[in-house]
Amino acid sequence: MSNKEGSGGFRKRKHDNFPHNQRREGKDVNSSSPVMLAFKSFQQELDARHDKYERLVKLSRDITVESKRTIFLLHRITSAPDMEDILTESEIKLDGVRQKIFQVAQELSGEDMHQFHRAITTGLQEYVEAVSFQHFIKTRSLISMDEINKQLIFTTEDNGKENKTPSSDAQDKQFGTWRLRVTPVDYLLGVADLTGELMRMCINSVGNGDIDTPFEVSQFLRQVYDGFSFIGNTGPYEVSKKLYTLKQSLAKVENACYALKVRGSEIPKHMLADVFSVKTEMIDQEEGIS
């Protein structure tokens, strides 16, 4: 039986047909050839992009952490005696976050943002959540994407006063402007995450005897949910996933408002938060079963 017919056969390689002394031996590579020089430049460019990507990931992580700290600080506003002190401190923290975003804008200067968007999207979403949470506490309204982007325009004056990252002398001498635009998807995802923080603020405010905030939050969340419903499944995949979480937050807030309206006079104020937490757990269990 031939090698081709047998199950364990093998095919000879083409160079096996040549005598050993006639095989082509590998030549020494000329490192100074135009082809090698071109590939070396490609290697340097790819390494530079990978390094930039890693720096952006680190900055995005810092933005996420500081934004979360700002959100935790703002949650203290339901129990703090002076709301203005909390808002002032939160503004200082957000200024620090914006300086991190300034460094991102400098890294992306002259680059296509979409090539590095995946590295910074998490931080931008968390920043949108923090700044929109602060804006809601101040005005009981939703901050627009244009307002957020106006806060992310930086000049060399910002670089000299607040930003500590090194820059070239030519760049310092020339009056320049850096900006970073929050994309519509980042904005929508940040607003969707905001609804969860508003739900927590609603429950905490009830525990402190504030019965007006839940109704204000409920009305606001209904408007946000209606807006997201217009997008539905036609928008980005991440937005459609957030829609379910938004609906959960709205249901919990509406349940709290219902209990306040119907049973508010029966339950002491210091026990309302416990009642709502129990009802919230029941809603979570029902949704988990379904």
Swiss-Prot record:
<keyword id="KW-1017">Isopeptide bond</keyword>
<dbReference type="GO" id="GO:0005634">
    <property type="term" value="C:nucleus"/>
</dbReference>
<dbReference type="GO" id="GO:0003677">
    <property type="term" value="F:DNA binding"/>
</dbReference>
<comment type="similarity">
    <text>Belongs to the translin family.</text>
</comment>
<dbReference type="GO" id="GO:0030422">
    <property type="term" value="P:siRNA processing"/>
</dbReference>
<comment type="function">
    <text>Acts in combination with TSN as an endonuclease involved in the activation of the RNA-induced silencing complex (RISC). Possible role in spermatogenesis.</text>
</comment>
<keyword id="KW-0460">Magnesium</keyword>
<feature type="cross-link" description="Glycyl lysine isopeptide (Lys-Gly) (interchain with G-Cter in SUMO2)">
    <location>
        <position position="279"/>
    </location>
</feature>
<dbReference type="GO" id="GO:0003723">
    <property type="term" value="F:RNA binding"/>
</dbReference>
<dbReference type="GO" id="GO:0003697">
    <property type="term" value="F:single-stranded DNA binding"/>
</dbReference>
<feature type="compositionally biased region" description="Basic and acidic residues">
    <location>
        <begin position="16"/>
        <end position="28"/>
    </location>
</feature>
<dbReference type="Pfam" id="PF01997">
    <property type="entry name" value="Translin"/>
</dbReference>
<dbReference type="GO" id="GO:0030154">
    <property type="term" value="P:cell differentiation"/>
</dbReference>
<feature type="region of interest" description="Interaction with C1D">
    <location>
        <begin position="73"/>
        <end position="208"/>
    </location>
</feature>
<dbReference type="InterPro" id="IPR002848">
    <property type="entry name" value="Translin_fam"/>
</dbReference>
<dbReference type="InterPro" id="IPR036081">
    <property type="entry name" value="Translin_sf"/>
</dbReference>
<dbReference type="GO" id="GO:0004521">
    <property type="term" value="F:RNA endonuclease activity"/>
</dbReference>
<keyword id="KW-0217">Developmental protein</keyword>
<dbReference type="InterPro" id="IPR016069">
    <property type="entry name" value="Translin_C"/>
</dbReference>
<dbReference type="GO" id="GO:0007283">
    <property type="term" value="P:spermatogenesis"/>
</dbReference>
<dbReference type="GO" id="GO:0046872">
    <property type="term" value="F:metal ion binding"/>
</dbReference>
<dbReference type="GO" id="GO:0005829">
    <property type="term" value="C:cytosol"/>
</dbReference>
<comment type="subunit">
    <text>Ring-shaped heterooctamer of six TSN and two TSNAX subunits. Interacts with GOLGA3, TSNAXIP1, SUN1 and AKAP9. Interacts with the homodimeric form of C1D following gamma-radiation. Interacts with TSN and C1D in a mutually exclusive manner.</text>
</comment>
<keyword id="KW-0963">Cytoplasm</keyword>
<keyword id="KW-0238">DNA-binding</keyword>
<dbReference type="GO" id="GO:0005794">
    <property type="term" value="C:Golgi apparatus"/>
</dbReference>
<dbReference type="GO" id="GO:0031687">
    <property type="term" value="F:A2A adenosine receptor binding"/>
</dbReference>
<dbReference type="GO" id="GO:0035194">
    <property type="term" value="P:regulatory ncRNA-mediated post-transcriptional gene silencing"/>
</dbReference>
<dbReference type="GO" id="GO:0048471">
    <property type="term" value="C:perinuclear region of cytoplasm"/>
</dbReference>
<dbReference type="GO" id="GO:1902555">
    <property type="term" value="C:endoribonuclease complex"/>
</dbReference>
<dbReference type="GO" id="GO:0005737">
    <property type="term" value="C:cytoplasm"/>
</dbReference>
<dbReference type="GO" id="GO:0043565">
    <property type="term" value="F:sequence-specific DNA binding"/>
</dbReference>
<keyword id="KW-0832">Ubl conjugation</keyword>
<keyword id="KW-0479">Metal-binding</keyword>
<keyword id="KW-0744">Spermatogenesis</keyword>
<keyword id="KW-0221">Differentiation</keyword>
<keyword id="KW-0539">Nucleus</keyword>
<feature type="binding site">
    <location>
        <position position="197"/>
    </location>
    <ligand>
        <name>Mg(2+)</name>
    </ligand>
</feature>
<protein>
    <recommendedName>
        <fullName>Translin-associated protein X</fullName>
    </recommendedName>
</protein>
<dbReference type="GO" id="GO:0044877">
    <property type="term" value="F:protein-containing complex binding"/>
</dbReference>
<dbReference type="GO" id="GO:0005654">
    <property type="term" value="C:nucleoplasm"/>
</dbReference>
<keyword id="KW-0333">Golgi apparatus</keyword>
